[in-house]
Amino acid sequence: MPIIKVRDNEPFDVALRRFKRSCEKAGILADVRAREFYEKPTTARKRAKAAAVKRLAKKLSRENARRVRLY
């Protein structure tokens, strides 16, 4: 769990914002949402594979767009 130290004369809002940012960087909220409901292993594998395919398609489309702009 992220820990922040509140500095002297630091407003509460600023400290809360720093804490939220550190939680987001640590990926706590995403992890909690992922574990909110049980996901069968087959469903998890299927979701991970779909994400990998999507990443690959995005990468290829970026490379193709770069090639088109070079000409």
UniProtKB/Swiss-Prot annotation:
Transmembrane segments: none
Keyword presence, Ribosomal protein: yes
GO molecular function: structural constituent of ribosome
Keywords on record: Ribonucleoprotein, Ribosomal protein
Signal peptide coordinates: none
GO cellular component terms, A-Z: ribonucleoprotein complex; ribosome
Coiled-coil positions: none
Database matches in InterPro entries: Ribosomal_bS21, Ribosomal_bS21_CS, Ribosomal_bS21_sf
GO biological process: translation
Family stated for the protein in its record: Belongs to the bacterial ribosomal protein bS21 family.
Matches recorded under PANTHER family: MITOCHONDRIAL 28S RIBOSOMAL PROTEIN S21, SMALL RIBOSOMAL SUBUNIT PROTEIN BS21
Protein name: Small ribosomal subunit protein bS21
Lineage: Bacteria, Pseudomonadati, Pseudomonadota, Gammaproteobacteria, Alteromonadales
